[in-house]
C-alpha cells in the first residue's frame, strides 16, 4: 500500500493525516494526549498560592448552594443521556465514562485557562500590560493545545479560542467558576457527544 492510499482524510474537527498512526481514533489517545496535558497545566498552576486563593473564592457560590449545583449537574447528565438516546447514539459504560471525562476536562481546563493562567500572567511578566491581555494569551494557548494535542483543524481552533474568550467574559461577570465549568461541560458534549472509536470518527 502506498503512502497516499494509507492516508486518512480530514474529519469534522480533526486534520487529515498522511500517517494513520498519527490520527487520533481512540479514547485512550484523547485521554493521554489532551487530558494529561491539560491536567498537568491545571495542577501545576494550583501550586501557586495566589491561584488557590482565587480558586476557593470562585467556588463560593458552589459551597453556598451545593444542592442547586448538584441538581443542575444531574439535569445536565440526564439531558446528555436523553440526547444520545434520541439521536440513536450507542449508550454503554464506555459512553458514560466519556461523559465523565468531558466533565473532568471541563474542570481542569477552566481552572487552568480561565482562572489560573490569566492571574499568573498578569502577576508576573505581564504586569505592565492589561489583565485582559493575560486572558487573551491564556485563551490563545488554550486553542493552540487543541491544535496540537487533538490535531484539530485551524478553523475549529479559532472557534475554540472565541469560545474561550466567551467563557472568560462570563467568568469575569459572574465570578462563578462552577457555573463556567457546567457551561463548558454542556458545550463540549454537544460538540463531541461520543468518544472516538475508529478512523471515521467525526466525519
Show where each model-derived region lies.
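Short, Lys/Arg-rich, polar N-terminal cytosolic tail immediately upstream
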Residues: 2-31
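Juxtamembrane helix-loop-helix connectors linking adjacent transmembrane helices
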Residues: 20-111, 118-129, 133, 200-203
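Transmembrane helix-loop-helix hairpins at the membrane interface
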Residues: 91-203
Amino acid at each position: 500500500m502506498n503512502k497516499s492510499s494509507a492516508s486518512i482524510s480530514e474529519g469534522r474537527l480533526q486534520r487529515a493525516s498522511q500517517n494513520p498512526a498519527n490520527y487520533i481514533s481512540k479514547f485512550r489517545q484523547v485521554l493521554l494526549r489532551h487530558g494529561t496535558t491539560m491536567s498537568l497545566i491545571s495542577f501545576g498552576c494550583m501550586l501557586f498560592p495566589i491561584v488557590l486563593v482565587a480558586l476557593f473564592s470562585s467556588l463560593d457560590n458552589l459551597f453556598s448552594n451545593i444542592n442547586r449545583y448538584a441538581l443542575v449537574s444531574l439535569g445536565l447528565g440526564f439531558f446528555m443521556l436523553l440526547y444520545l438516546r434520541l439521536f440513536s447514539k450507542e449508550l454503554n459504560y464506555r459512553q458514560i465514562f466519556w461523559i465523565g471525562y468531558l466533565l473532568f476536562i471541563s474542570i481542569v481546563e477552566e481552572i487552568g485557562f480561565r482562572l489560573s493562567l490569566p492571574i499568573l500572567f498578569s502577576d508576573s511578566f505581564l504586569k505592565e500590560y492589561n489583565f485582559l491581555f493575560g486572558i487573551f494569551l491564556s485563551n490563545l494557548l488554550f486553542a493552540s493545545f487543541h491544535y496540537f494535542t487533538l490535531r484539530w483543524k485551524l478553523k475549529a481552533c479559532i472557534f475554540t479560542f472565541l469560545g474561550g474568550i466567551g467563557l472568560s467574559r462570563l467568568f469575569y461577570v459572574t465570578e462563578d467558576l462552577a457555573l463556567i465549568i457546567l457551561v463548558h461541560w454542556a458545550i463540549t458534549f454537544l460538540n463531541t457527544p461520543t468518544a472516538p472509536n475508529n478512523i471515521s470518527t467525526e466525519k
